[in-house]
């Protein structure tokens, strides 16, 4: 059985490394990129089963909600489940994110990093 493939988009180097390492140790195949602006090139190279997207990117970067909207404009990308990572807590508009196809929202910091792996497996197509 092929492992679930994940595209992880996280700007914080340490967090990106920890999340990628945790998911890989659990048997998931992870491609990790630091900027949301790189997501479209990464998707053209191969479609993941799940996208894990940090909603809050640094100022001047493509923002998470904009990425979600663009993902839904391309037929090949529209059905890819997206797990949002957000330090914004209740500020995240859950109606908007659901409409944009978000499968799950996890708050940051994650106290139990294995929760990410469980969530990715649960939403994988």
List the model feature ranges, each with a label.
Residues 47-49, 76-81:
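His-Asp phosphorelay/catalytic-motif detector in bacterial-type signaling
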Residues 46-57:
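Active-site beta3 strand of CheY-like receiver
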Residues 62, 66, 89-106, 110, ...:
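Alpha4 helix (beta4-alpha4-beta5 surface) of REC/receiver domains from two-component response regulators
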Residues 27-36, 42:
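Short hydrophobic/Thr-rich beta-strand motif most characteristic of the beta2 strand and flanking loop
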Residues 17-25:
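Charged docking surfaces used in two-component/phosphorelay signaling
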Residues 10:
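Conserved acidic carboxylate
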Residues 41, 63-78:
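Short amphipathic alpha-helix used as the core "switch/output" element in two-component signaling
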